[in-house]
């Protein structure tokens, strides 16, 4: 499955027509590539989704490709396991994640009496935590009402491992297991990207590393001493642009203490970062 998208900030008819032409051109290139490699593109499984703000109510016309195939707009598409809607609210993705995780948790509860207590955490990591950590960087810019819904999954898992009762504190169970909350795990993932952008750009994709540069001035300033980042992209819309991973990397990295930014090795940085986020999440400062 090939997923092609475009970003139209201006919203004018001319820009939309140009973007449609680019998508049709990209589709023909992909189709030619597959034909040369003895593959056939299935138009019935090809999806087209326009992304827009909630206030934009204009309907989008179907996309007509070069081979006269008509693709109608979809409200939701699945891309690499993540369900994306036209407003990028990720409500459907969170609902699907909760259903799959709680289904796995119910299955594990049925065999808990046969599993040693020392192996319960391993089972949780294999069947549920791996789902929570997959593409977890999208949880950081989620609306505030959705993050607690994801957090309830981890809370139930923590009580399952520790044997806590229904009305016991989930925070105490997570603290006992030394688990970072969902929001902190998302920050951890994004900050590991930021560290590789600053220190080892060859280990990060170019589309993530190219917009960034370290702040340098002609004289000694606090920014020079703090190893802060600067992004060439301009974020015009707070509710949309500032939810992007580019803005999240910039904000979270520049908010870190300067001693964490200068840690020389990636392994030591991850260890120190987890300790910092753990103390911050459970207010241990």
Please name every model-derived segment:
Residues 1-285:
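Hydrophobic/basic alpha-helical segments
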């Amino acid at each position: 499955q090939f997923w092609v998208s475009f970003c139209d900030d201006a919203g004018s008819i001319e820009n939309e027509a140009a973007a449609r032409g680019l998508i049709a051109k990209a589709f023909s290139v992909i189709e030619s590539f597959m034909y040369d490699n003895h593959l056939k593109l299935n138009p019935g499984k090809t999806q087209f989704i326009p992304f827009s703000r909630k206030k934009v109510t204009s309907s989008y016309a179907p996309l007509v490709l070069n081979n006269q195939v008509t693709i109608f707009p979809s409200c939701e598409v699945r891309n690499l396991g993540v369900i994306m809607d036209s407003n990028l609210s990720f409500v459907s993705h969170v609902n699907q994640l909760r259903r799959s995780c709680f289904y796995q948790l119910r299955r594990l509860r049925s065999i808990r009496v046969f599993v040693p207590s020392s192996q319960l955490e391993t089972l949780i990591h294999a069947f549920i935590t791996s789902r929570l950590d997959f593409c977890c960087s999208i949880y950081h810019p989620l609306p505030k009402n959705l993050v607690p819904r994801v957090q309830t999954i981890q809370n139930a898992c923590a009580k399952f491992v520790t044997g806590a009762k229904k009305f016991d504190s989930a925070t105490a169970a997570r603290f006992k297991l030394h688990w970072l909350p969902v929001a902190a795990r998302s920050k951890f993932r994004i900050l590991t990207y930021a560290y590789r952008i600053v220190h080892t750009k060859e280990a990060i994709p170019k589309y993530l590393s190219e917009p960034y540069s370290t702040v340098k001035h002609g004289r000694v300033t606090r920014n020079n001493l703090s190893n802060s980042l600067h992004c060439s992209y301009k974020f015009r819309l707070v509710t949309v642009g500032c939810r992007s991973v580019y803005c999240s990397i910039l904000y979270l990295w520049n908010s870190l203490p300067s001693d964490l930014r200068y840690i020389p090795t990636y392994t030591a940085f991850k260890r120190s970062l987890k300790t910092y986020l753990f103390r911050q999440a459970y207010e241990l400062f």
